[in-house]
């Protein structure tokens, strides 16, 4: 299968490319390196050093014997997207190329607008390129469980069968996202569903939970194949952040009561889910939705798990919640679709957390401690960037 990965230089895009390549698929990458630019803007860098994309691709060719063409450009340039899709002629497009941080989108007006422009316009350009070139191309799009919010009912996988005043229908599950980033993902989902309905496109929307981890089977093969590890208050996911705080001897900072419950997933399972979705494509005209996570935990449960696993003393500190969200709520989400396709989950365990501790210990001199604390407050319309250059 010919697979085009949008955002192929990113935290998830790069290990996904390796995972698909080693399993016999022809893979090409698209990126504009804006994620690396955001490191400069924020004054913080990946905990684990990451090579340039040129060096990564060259190393992969040496290690595996497999080449991966690279296209450099911005998905907001619709003509360029058309050109890339025509040139590579993929069977599947995996779309990671979006600004992925809720706090970043809530910094101020400029960052909110940039997030929505990048994410929504870029995805629209991809949809138009598929419709113009080959409507059989399968779009595998990374969404987020954050689209749903925390409703007081069970969350279904994308669609809801309902009966209202004696009539029945099937509708998209109601969305109540908690940031301008999450809203951009909702807009994407609606746009993709509409494109499937009017153009007969085939798409799989993967509403992913909070990702943790840094290593996959393929990234371990050479240091130049490593993917990034973000721990800061803007891009760092909660488990990655807690492991850094534990290693540094800092309290694990839980926002508010800590009852915020989310689906979580190991990065090893993320790449597995993408492959399973790509190898079992949606049918023409289908907007298929899977909830992509393997277990659900509250923030406090995650903190307690990390604290119990760390060999030293680790305290848990409750801090004022910078976000506007429910801190104690019902949460139960369906996630059987990917299991039915063959997903074998890697659940959170002491062994896995120990591996994160080792990564953090190995690179702790690269940590900027001031970048860990939250500085973006949802109720403010202008936030300062701590540590920015």
Task: Give short role names for the model-derived ranges.
Residues 1-214, 378-380, 388:
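N-terminal Rossmann-like NAD(P)+-binding domain of SDR-like oxidoreductases, especially those catalyzing
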Residues 186, 198-201, 213-240, 248-250, ...:
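Glycine/proline-rich active-site loop of Rossmann-fold NAD(P)-dependent oxidoreductases
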Residues 123, 127, 192, 239, ...:
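Short-chain dehydrogenase/reductase
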Residues 187-191, 195, 242, 302, ...:
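Hydrophobic alpha-helix immediately C-terminal to the catalytic Tyr-X-X-X-Lys motif of short-chain
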Residues 54-66, 160-171, 211, 215-217, ...:
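A short C-terminal helix-loop "cap" of Rossmann-like NAD(P)-dependent dehydrogenase/epimerase domains
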Residues 246-389:
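C-terminal substrate-binding subdomain of Rossmann-fold SDR/epimerase-dehydratase oxidoreductases
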Residues 6, 117-120, 181-182, 232-236, ...:
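Short, solvent-exposed loop/helix junctions and linker helices
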